[in-house]
Amino acid sequence: MTARAIIIGAPRSGSGKTSVTIGLLRAFARRGVKVRGIKTGPDYIDPGFHAFATGTPGLNLDSWAMQPDLLRHLFSQQTEDAELILIESAMGLFDGIPVAENRTGSAADLARLFRIPVLLVLDVSGQSQTAATIAHGFAHYDPDVTMGAVVLNRAGSERHRTLCTEAIEKIGLPVVGCVLRDPSLILPERHLGLVQASEHPEIDPHIDRLADAMEKSIDLDTLFSLAAPVDMPCGSVAAAIAPPGQRIALAEDAAFTFLYPHLRRHWRAAGAEIVPFSPLADEAPDESCDICWLPGGYPELFAGKLADAVGFKAGITRFAETKPVHGECGGYMVLGERLEDAEGVIHAMTGLLSHATSFATRKMNLGYRQATIAADSPLGMAGDVLRGHEFHYARVIDPGRDQPFAHMADGQGRPLGPSGGRRGFVSGTFFHAIAKGG
């Protein structure tokens, strides 16, 4: 079976890519097509929606953080037993950072690398024929990135659709569908993006409504034929992050949700066993595990409950006496001494590290990061370089007394200083690791 693939891109965030992608995934799945979803860039939330829409795990591909051979390997894995791959772009299609060619982090990099056409989603609210100038720009901006077709989104009426369609088709781009404006299709959001699929109270009915809208509005047969057959080498896992232990105690509940699908998949494929536990249910890490991993998530929304989880706190403290504990972002916040929530209430955390964080005065920290590990750790040896990102609103209000976990640089290599902390067997940082550097 040869899979076909197409990238779903747009001029900017907020154009409706996610709703269109989720709806198309479910619509094709309902037709019996073996369809899979991929999200470009560092995004934990959208792959969860892709998984709910298809019943199969999602995946992230990031051309800045992942070396080309790792991209090929992960993409090849996702195409196994699949007929159609829909790749949802982050932000605008060409948006990335100004670094080496095809390593910018943009979805356009993947279009070039994999020779995949783009389905351009245009939010035409507030315009009509002018949408054709945007489509024209996309069609001619980069000769190595092919615009396969256009989908109009948030049109106000059939007349509005006709005006936009006629103008765009005059420049030689087919319009394969038009989704009319419908507030009921909007997905709820919060400070780190969309409310996660697992927390959406009516997720399946909502995805079905999106699928109904796509079935009604988009020519699915034409879209399938526009997707390009995938034919590429299998790549390599050399740049993948190795399992941090043989048995990994993984915090997994509404407060700890951000573990990239490719990491979980690779760790299991490498022979590691993941043993989940729930701090919110006052569960401690299994003492038979080799390492405890606290991923990112939303501990600030559950700070009071975590502070009261005496069994969890005692268990992880006992675990950390002899075995490694690592926390990323939200997990790092919980490893500190205290966490101040949005209302200014201070909650005692585990105290395994000495810092304190606050969500009361929010400041967005966002961007690609290169982390040089300061000392041997579960993520690598001293001097090893990892690529990943930060995305959080919390601030460190007391840096504590611990040694840094890593020395950080931004996506262009500019130094940002020390990051995180380490003490004994415990380490943590706001940095989310994606892959080995290089």
Swiss-Prot record:
This protein's record includes keyword Nucleotidyltransferase: no
UniProt lineage: Bacteria, Pseudomonadati, Pseudomonadota, Alphaproteobacteria, Hyphomicrobiales
Note: The a and c carboxylates of hydrogenobyrinate are activated for nucleophilic attack via formation of a phosphorylated intermediate by ATP. CobB catalyzes first the amidation of the c-carboxylate, and then that of the a-carboxylate.
Keywords: ATP-binding, Cobalamin biosynthesis, Glutamine amidotransferase, Ligase, Magnesium, Nucleotide-binding
Keyword Chloroplast set for record: no
SUPFAM superfamilies from the UniProt entry: Class I glutamine amidotransferase-like, P-loop containing nucleoside triphosphate hydrolases
Membership in a protein family: Belongs to the CobB/CbiA family.
EC category name: ligase
Name of the protein in question: Hydrogenobyrinate a,c-diamide synthase
Organism expressing this protein natively: Agrobacterium fabrum (strain C58 / ATCC 33970)
Matching PANTHER family: COBYRINATE A,C-DIAMIDE SYNTHASE
Annotated site residues (Increases nucleophilicity of active site Cys) in this chain: H432
Family annotation (CDD domains): CobB_N
Function, in words: Catalyzes the ATP-dependent amidation of the two carboxylate groups at positions a and c of hydrogenobyrinate, using either L-glutamine or ammonia as the nitrogen source.
GO molecular function, one term: ATP binding
Any single GO BP term: cobalamin biosynthetic process
The reaction(s) this protein catalyses: hydrogenobyrinate + 2 L-glutamine + 2 ATP + 2 H2O = hydrogenobyrinate a,c-diamide + 2 L-glutamate + 2 ADP + 2 phosphate + 2 H(+)
InterPro entries: CbiA/CobB_synth, Class_I_gatase-like, CobQ/CobB/MinD/ParA_Nub-bd_dom, GATase_3, P-loop_NTPase
Active-site positions on this chain: C329 (nucleophile)
Cofactor(s) needed by this chain: Mg(2+)
The GATase cobBQ-type domain, residue ranges: 247-438
Domain notes for this protein: Comprises of two domains. The C-terminal domain contains the binding site for glutamine and catalyzes the hydrolysis of this substrate to glutamate and ammonia. The N-terminal domain is anticipated to bind ATP and hydrogenobyrinate and catalyzes the ultimate synthesis of the diamide product. The ammonia produced via the glutaminase domain is probably translocated to the adjacent domain via a molecular tunnel, where it reacts with an activated intermediate.
EC number: 6.3.5.9
